Amino acid sequence: MRHWLVALAALAVVSFLGAQERNLEHADVNLWENTTFHQESVDCSRLTEGIIRAKIDGSWQEFEIRQLPSGFQEWSFGKRAATLERFRTGQPPELAGPHNGMVATSGIARSDSRFAINNAVKGMGWLPYDEKLAEVIELLESTIDEEFSAKLDRLDSLYKQGTRLYDPTRQVSLELYSTPEFETGTFLNQMVNPACAVVFLDIPSYEFKAIAHLMHPDDPKLTETEKLQVQYANLIHSYFHGAFDKQFIGVVYYVIEVYDNSPGKPEAKGKRVVPELPLMP
């Protein structure tokens, strides 16, 4: 009996040490090449045709990229202008609104979980048209050291341009936390299964389903436009929050479907508004 107890104790120690050596905040698949990565599950080569290809649930599929509807645009730009005004008067931002997108994903479980599903709040924003990226980047870089009030005015003037400046087929975000040593559930899922849903807590309440394109700033395979997208995403983040000592992973969400989840409206309550029914996406 004593021999069995010694053996079990030894096994427990070995198991504990093994768990200590294994990085549980990581997946059992390596998505990195040293300190960078290239997302292999998204093909952006046909964006000029309005098409994005993605590997979803193990098979490559084509998706037509669509515009966020006018209602979403008016709500988003209007709420952003109102948030800038709150900062001018010394008030904190609201949690509700177009900045905080709740991103639902599914793909691969992190080693500390039995579930491959994940949900996380991500800061979202508008992305200028490809041909306007360099111009906006130059403007932001030349004014980033101005007084905060002046920067608020400049952001307000940019938002007032609406879709004359910003591309209504996409939203942009940053993956702030994922590294070769630590991977978020959102990062893991989007790397292997880039389809996701993004919903906003507000009234009206919009949801869009999208293909997420992840771009590491040091990825040598990025196109010139993709490099500018990553640069812009980091710059607009620093423009408001202050400088950071690193460039973060950029994420562009290409819009495929849009839903109006607003309560109390018979034409909403989860109805798909883009593309309009009965057309299948």
What do the predicted segments below correspond to?
Residues A19-P281:
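Binding-site signature for planar aromatic cofactors or substrates
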Residues R2-L8:
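Sec-dependent signal peptide recognition
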Residues A10-G18:
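Hydrophobic h-region of N-terminal signal peptides that target proteins for export
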